Amino acid sequence: MEEQGMGIRVEAMSPEYAHQATAWAERLGLPLQDDAAGFAVQVGADGLQIQQLGPQAPGPVRVDFVDGQAAHRRQFGGGNGQMIAKAVGIAQGVRPQVLDATAGLGKDAFVLASLGCQMTLIERQPLIAALLEDGLTRARSDDEVGPIVGRMRLLTGNAIERMRNWEGEAPQVIYLDPMFPHRDKSALVKKEMRVFRPLVGDDLDAPALLEAALALASHRVVVKRPRKAPIIDGPKPSHSLEGKSSRYDIYPKKALKA
């Protein structure tokens, strides 16, 4: 048997999803057959998911804004008192327009949208963007979550280029959560990180990301970092909000007002 590699194939979970699988394969430029693939983009009743293949592989990764972790955080996450809410400047009468330039699976953007912020998301990795698009599409039909994801607009491509060539009104706040090269072991075992790492790699362009964000944002830039990680090379943040495992470095440009 061939060793599991870095290749990616698309597969239908059952015959009725073969047409959708073919459509995604064409769109993503991926094969429907690859016995040596290390990953599979699977299409089924629960939408789109990425499954790492092989005997030690963790479970699938998908975007679900309606049930599970997202639902729990929406109901019990602490509302406007959450650190991320304070970091982006949510306050009484203030719901900034936020650009999440490193969207990933959209968890932080969804939290901010659920608190009333108009969100624009950028995701550079086409597979992750596909998961996000699929999750947003499914969530739109939910009575409770539909209005929240209605505040989330997804863009794909290189966030640095997107920000440098921005058209229209600048976002008030830009939120960055770059991949960090040396997560501690407990975080590394999270299945999402195990799947993400080989597909996405580290964001070694974090200083350029910060520079582009500072040039574009009208009011502030917020950078999420592991708690003990160094600040990104470049201008120093004015202050930080620190939690148990992560912190938010805040780069203000002007005050957000109601």
Curated annotation (Swiss-Prot):
S-adenosyl-L-methionine binds at residues 123-124, 177. Pfam families: SAM_MT. It comes from the Bacteria. GO terms for cellular component: cytoplasm. Residues 239-252 have a biased composition (Basic and acidic residues). Keywords: Cytoplasm, Methyltransferase, rRNA processing, S-adenosyl-L-methionine, Transferase. Its main location: cytoplasm. Residues 232-258 are annotated as: Disordered. Its EC number is 2.1.1.242. It is found in: Cytoplasm. Specifically methylates the guanosine in position 1516 of 16S rRNA. HAMAP family: 16SrRNA_methyltr_J. Belongs to the methyltransferase superfamily. RsmJ family. This is Ribosomal RNA small subunit methyltransferase J. The gene is rsmJ.
